[in-house]
C-alpha cells in the first residue's frame, strides 16, 4: 500500500519518510471510518432495520439507530488501535520484529479493522451501555491530549514567526504583522464570543451560564496578562499574546459547546435534545486536526510539560531514490508506536461521544429484542455529563497553559522546549 501511495520505482518523485507514509495510512483509515460514522449518525439505511441489535429502537427513530451504529463503528476502530498499541509496547528499535507489523502487513490490518467493525454489530447492546461511559471517560482523556497539542502548536507557531522575523530582518515585518493580527484577532474573537454568549445564554436567572462565561473570561485574561509579564518572559521568552489568544479562543469555544449541550430547560436555548450542528462540525474539525497533528509528531508530545523522551531517527536511506520511500527508522523508531495508537483509540471514542452528543443508554433491559412499537432506549444528553466535561476541560487548558508559564520559574533546572 505504501508503494502505491508514494509511487512505483522508476518514477521521478520526491521520496517521503517511511514513518510518515505509515502514519498517513492510519490517518486515512481514521478519516474513512469517521466519515462513515458521521453519515450514519444522521441517515440509516433500510437494511439496518434487519439487525437485531437495532430493534430496541422505536420504528422511525433514526437518532437511536444512528447512535447505536456510531457506537459500533467507533468501538471497532478503537479496539483496532488498542490491540496494535498493546502489541507495540516498548518497541524502540527498527530491528524489533513487531516494528514490521507497524509499517507493513497492510492487507492483513485492513482485514482486521473490517472484521472488528463487522463483529461489533453482533455484540449485545448491554455491552454498549457500559461502552458509552468508557467512551465518555476516554473522550475526556482525548480532550486533555487536544489541550496539550493546542498549547504546543501555539508555541511552535509563535516561535516560527519570531524566528522568521529575526532571520529576515527588515523584510520580516510581514511576519510581525501576521503575528499581531493572529494574536489580537484571537483575543477579539474570544471577547466577542463571550459577549454574545452573555446576551443569548446568560440572560435572566441563568446564573450557572453567567458563571461559566464570566469565570472563563476572567481566568483567561489573568493568564494572558501573566504571559507578557517581565518575570515570565525572563524564564519563558517564547511566551506572548498569541498563545494566550489561542487558548482564550479555544476555551471560549468549549464554554459555547458546553452551554449548547445543556438539556432543554430555562437556561438552554435548545428546545430539543439535539445538539447544534455548528458544535458538532467544529468539534469534528478539532478532532481531525488533533489526530493528524499527533500522528505526525516525532515523539510523545510531553516536552512542553518538561518531560523529554525523544525518539531518534536515521534519515539517510540509500534506497530512497528508487523506492520513493526513505527509511528514517534504520535503527531507532521515529515516534512512540504505543502512544500513537493510544491517541487514535481515544480519538475514536471521543468521536463516538461527539457524534452521539454524549448519549447514554437508559437503565431499561436492552438485551431483549423489542417490537417496533417499543420506546427508544437511547437517552441523548439526558444529564449534565458533557456540559461538565467541557467546562472542566476549559479550566484544565488554562491550568496547563499557566503551568507552561510558571513551570520554568519553579523548576529552573529542567529544560523547557
From Swiss-Prot:
InterPro entries cross-referenced by the UniProt entry: TDE1/TMS
Role: Enhances the incorporation of serine into phosphatidylserine and sphingolipids.
Location(s) in or outside the cell: Endoplasmic reticulum membrane
Listed name of the protein: Probable serine incorporator
Key words, A-Z: Endoplasmic reticulum, Lipid biosynthesis, Lipid metabolism, Membrane, Phospholipid biosynthesis, Phospholipid metabolism, Transmembrane, Transmembrane helix
Example of a GO biological process term: phospholipid biosynthetic process
Annotated transmembrane regions: 25-45, 69-89, 104-124, 131-151, 180-200, 208-228, 239-259, 276-296, 339-359, 391-411
Topology relative to the membrane: Multi-pass membrane protein
Sequence similarity: Belongs to the TDE1 family.
Any GO CC annotation of this UniProt entry: endoplasmic reticulum membrane
